[in-house]
């Protein structure tokens, strides 16, 4: 994970011509390196994983290691949301302490 130097938001990992590029919603981009490689694996018990994701999403706003972005919650108007990335498709989810969730991807 990379943090944008321009706006302090989390950058999203993308792949361009086999290269890792981190892009931010503000337009900034940074070249990745070998430290940013992702190892994937096959998930066999999808029902169990859905339950684990629910718990992960619910607890995400309270984990200080997760990325926080400056975006107001439409529910409680808190001035930041927690950004997490889940699943093999790397779906970006925005979560608030009040329980609000948004699938950005």
Swiss-Prot record:
It comes from the Viruses. Zn(2+) 1 binds at residues 4, 7, 24, 26. One of its GO terms (biological process) is viral transcription. Coiled coil: none annotated. Zn(2+) 2 binds at residues 73, 76, 96. Its main location: host cell. GO terms for cellular component: DNA-directed RNA polymerase complex; host cell cytoplasm. It is found in: Host cytoplasm. Keywords: DNA-directed RNA polymerase, Early protein, Host cytoplasm, Metal-binding, Transcription, Viral transcription, Zinc, Zinc-finger. A zinc finger (C4-type) spans 4-26. Induction: Expressed in the early phase of the viral replicative cycle. GO terms for molecular function: zinc ion binding. Belongs to the Asfivirus DNA-directed RNA polymerase RPB9 homolog family. Component of the DNA-directed RNA polymerase (RNAP) that catalyzes the transcription in the cytoplasm of viral DNA into RNA using the four ribonucleoside triphosphates as substrates. Part of the viral DNA-directed RNA polymerase that consists of 8 polII-like subunits (RPB1, RPB2, RPB3, RPB5, RPB6, RPB7, RPB9, RPB10), a capping enzyme and a termination factor. This is DNA-directed RNA polymerase RPB9 homolog. It comes from African swine fever virus (isolate Tick/Malawi/Lil 20-1/1983) (ASFV).
């Amino acid at each position: 994970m990379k943090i944008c130097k321009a706006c302090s938001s989390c950058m999203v990992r993308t792949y361009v011509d086999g290269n890792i590029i981190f892009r931010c919603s503000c337009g900034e981009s940074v070249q990745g390196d070998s430290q940013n490689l992702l190892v994937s694996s096959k998930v066999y018990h999808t029902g169990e994983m859905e339950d684990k994701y629910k718990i992960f999403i619910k607890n995400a706003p309270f984990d200080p290691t997760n990325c926080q972005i400056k975006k107001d919650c439409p529910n409680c108007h808190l001035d930041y949301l927690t950004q997490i990335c889940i699943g093999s498709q790397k779906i970006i989810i925005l979560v608030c302490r009040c329980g609000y969730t948004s699938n950005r991807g």
